[in-house]
């Protein structure tokens, strides 16, 4: 097992799905969708099971590592920031009653935004194979709190690197 840090660059918008109401200047309430956050309200959170189900799909496409992907564990906190100004949120347009066009705002990662995720990968999956698995996830599934099946959250893999030790050095001296 080894811990890896994966950097991803979004190719389509990745939209938040946590519905909250905000008031405009006229005191009217509007629904706005935010990214899910860690309990302390800080980092953006992507559920580990989103990654797991997408990796299972990628393993089927690759026809390799069908069992081993069950051993991949993802940290739920995402290393990435969005623009917190609601005026800059993504506008998702849809048809209202009749032919009128409406929109709702989503906090989002936009194409070109880069995030980092940490995961633990079994030794039986090589770095090259893990890259290929993540590439399939990014091109065909995506990762987005709001409707990845509608094409949101597609990405390209930028880098995969071993995560530096967090608790001291690998060269530990004992007395």
Residue ranges and their predicted role:
Residues 1-175:
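RNA-interacting cores
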């Amino acid at each position: 097992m080894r811990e890896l840090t994966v950097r991803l660059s979004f190719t389509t918008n990745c939209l938040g799905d946590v519905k909250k109401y905000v008031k405009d200047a006229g005191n009217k309430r509007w629904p706005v969708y935010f990214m899910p956050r860690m309990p302390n309200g800080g980092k953006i959170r992507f559920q580990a099971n989103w990654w797991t189900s997408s990796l299972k799909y990628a393993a089927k496409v690759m026809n390799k590592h069908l069992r081993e992907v069950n051993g991949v564990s993802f940290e739920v906190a995402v290393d990435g920031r969005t623009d917190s100004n609601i005026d800059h949120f993504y506008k998702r347009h849809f048809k209202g009653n009749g032919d009128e066009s409406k929109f709702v705002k989503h906090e989002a990662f936009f194409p070109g935004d880069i995030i980092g995720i940490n995961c633990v990968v079994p030794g039986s999956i090589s770095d090259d194979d893990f890259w290929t698995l993540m590439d399939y996830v990014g091109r065909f599934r995506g990762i987005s709190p709001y409707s990845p099946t509608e094409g949101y959250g597609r990405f390209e893999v930028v880098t995969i690197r071993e995560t530096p030790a967090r608790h001291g050095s690998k060269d530990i001296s004992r007395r």
